[in-house]
Amino acid sequence: MHQTQPSLFGKLMTMFAGFALSGAVLAAPAAAPSATPQVEIKTSMGDIVVELDREKAPKSVDNFLAYVKSGFYKGTIFHRVIDGFMIQTGGFDEKLKQKKTNKAIPIESQNGLLNNKYTVAMARTGDPNSATSQFFINVENNDALNYPGRDGFGYTVFGKVIKGEDVVDKIKGVLVDDKGMFQNIPVIPIVIKSATILKTPIPPKQ
């Protein structure tokens, strides 16, 4: 999914176990980062929880979490919605102003994760190594986006929706229009209110 450009898509705790030795307190090593962190994305149409795959897409996951931790996604909109394809967000505010991003990351599309329905993937320009903050949720199985794709690279999947699939389905069906350089933009803005890492992960579905 092309990244839209201005000119044109339990609880984590640090535990310290120490003991006094000659007046010094020794701390236990911090817990390793979760291999499957979960992020709750609260939108104006409902809440979505995504589970990330750090093992298969480490750079993409760490990049996404950095934006989440900084509060970057608050106030961004779903600026491209195509029923039968995907819903895209993470780059523009309600005034359609593009937000300043961090450095682009390398593509990880050869990780074996597929652009199937309800998976989360990085948006980018024609440059395979141009992904920054924008991401999209596949609303169907999009085989054409898998590596190598039509351009020889495909699109990096780094997670999946594990709660709020109904919200994704509502978003994909909204009325859209073209506005300036934006195509398929919702007529009524769909806004991300917050994106936060869940301290208590949702257990796997039985």
Model-identified regions with their sequence ranges:
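Cyclophilin-like peptidyl-prolyl cis-trans isomerases
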Residues: 2-12, 16, 23-206
